[in-house]
Amino acid sequence: MVTAILRAVAVAAAVCLSLAAHAHADPAKVLRVSSKDIASLDPQQGTDLRSTRVASAIFEGLYQFDYLAEPAKVVPNTAEAMPVITGGGKVWTIKLLRGIHFTDSPAFKGKPRELVAEDYVYSIKRSIDPNLLGGDPALTDLIEGARPVVDAARPGAKFDFDAPIAGLRAIDRYTLQIRLTSVDYTLLERLAGLSMTAVAREVVEAAGNDIKSQPVGTGPYMLKEWKRASRVVLEANPNYRGLQFPESTAPRQQALVQSMRGKTLPQIGRIEISIIEEPLPDLLAFSQGNLDYVGLAGDDLNRVLVGSELKPELARMGVVRMRYSAPTIIFTYFNMKDPVVGGYSQAQIALRRAIAMGFNVEESIRVLYGGEALPANQLLPPGVDGHDDSLPPKSIYDPAAARALLDRFGFKDLDGDGYRETPDGKPLTLVRGTLPESWFREFDALWKKNMDAIGIRMEVVQRTFGELLNMSRAGKLMMFNLAYRSLDPSGYEILQTLWSHSPVDGNPSQFANADYDRAYEQFLQTPAGPGRVTLARRMSDISQAYVPMQLSTFGIGNTLLYPWVEGYWPSQFGFSWKYLDIDLAKRKAAGK
């Protein structure tokens, strides 16, 4: 009887909290932002950063990254507390908060649907389903008993979500237990990632192939509208439990914390995301007050600066510039199975190395990034565990050495047209995938100029980003430029791009090297510190020896925001719109 009364009180308190949270999400407060087009709002089928940003407002994981913590720190989200770890690090037990509910869906048949441990069992199973973007081989082998269930779904068979997995089970309604085959120091960060957020099985099954566009989560926002290639609209979740702005003792964050203290979040009732593919229209929309903040780089950043300061007209409006190191690496991968640039022979490696040495990274930083980038000298960017600060940030650009290397391995101009042939006398032509955007046209021109300088003919195949991704997954691109952003401080996702067991979506070059694989697997079992740096350095050395990718730049981020945007912090791993607020009086005074 006492237990029943306590449960009733807990439910009533949860309802009151939800109502209070909804009352604080003001429909008049509309956050206006931009994004390139998104591909999927299914958390287990969303890999690009822009889809991740939107989906992260809708779905919730057991854990999340603290918004303000530096260095990054994992904290509970829907979990009651941090995991209880026993069994020598191999048994993780996690209790869920009670009273969290999914937003309404016809799949729930008019009844409230509480989040339970079984939802995370189902969602983690989806994240290892090989039919969904190839699954997650590393996680599959980490969870005890998962491999046979995953293998039974190959090739093309449906994943059996009812098949028990010994290492993944709900031991009661609110308790999840994960049993591991080995210690893995990245698991906690994985549990804070989008692919481990909770979906409801009945929603997924009802939506079928439309699940990418029918998201139903427990997060602070829910999808109201999605017009492809036009806009996405989110509205505050009326059932959200509400939260307080994070605390911090860092001196540079004190004014921010004080301004947000006491507010129940989310404060913003509606988020309007305009799909804008080009940076110049993005900047124009911001300048006209149609966007509340905007990220800029390269020439577009130079359009708003005089030297290193904002132009007077922007400064007079109170626009703030935030500059920060972004855990991003930009690279061009080589398809290791391509007959021209692929392979592991000395001549094939020499060709890739010469191409990498022939591209002027410093010039690309000046021309394309307005100086706001760093030459990538290793796989992991600054701010990520494993990055070696002792390595000088410089590129390997050396066109004379590139030409000499090509000559040495028989790539010579046999017909006098200024372009080299292969050692067996066949035409040598590089083909890069590229996008129909102004930035990429400049990038393509730089590539062609640099390759002309070392005597290699280069052509491009121009498609939309989605089409290029599909071609990449099918192994039909010779070369393609990609940007990978580490979504957690361990950097394992970036290192995973050269792990041979990753699906093509995760390892687009299809690089395979046993030494690299061993170093990567050891990295997962090594805590943050010097050991990780040593292993990451080893993987970088292996990648530079075989050159499956040409490393280009590390990112520097720049965000401009109007003074009515409150709560903004350039959190590299914990950013969420739920922490923001809009000062309507300031916006009205500015006439925006």
Please tell me what each predicted stretch does:
Residues 28-37, 90-95, 120-123, 176-177, ...:
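Short, well-ordered beta-strand elements
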Residues 68-69, 149-175, 179-272, 277-281, ...:
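Gly/Pro-rich hinge or "lid" segments in bacterial periplasmic/extracellular proteins
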Residues 81-139, 177, 282-285, 345-347, ...:
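Aromatic- and charge-enriched surface segment that lines or borders ligand/interaction sites
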Residues 29-31, 35, 182-185, 215-216, ...:
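Detector for C-terminal structural segments
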Residues 8-18:
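Bacterial N-terminal signal peptides
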Residues 224-235, 259-260, 272-338, 362, ...:
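Extracellular/periplasmic solute-recognition and catalytic clefts
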Residues 34-87, 216:
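N-terminal lobe/hinge region of extracytoplasmic solute-binding protein
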Residues 216, 273-282, 299, 460-470:
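Short helix-initiation/N-cap motifs at beta->coil->alpha
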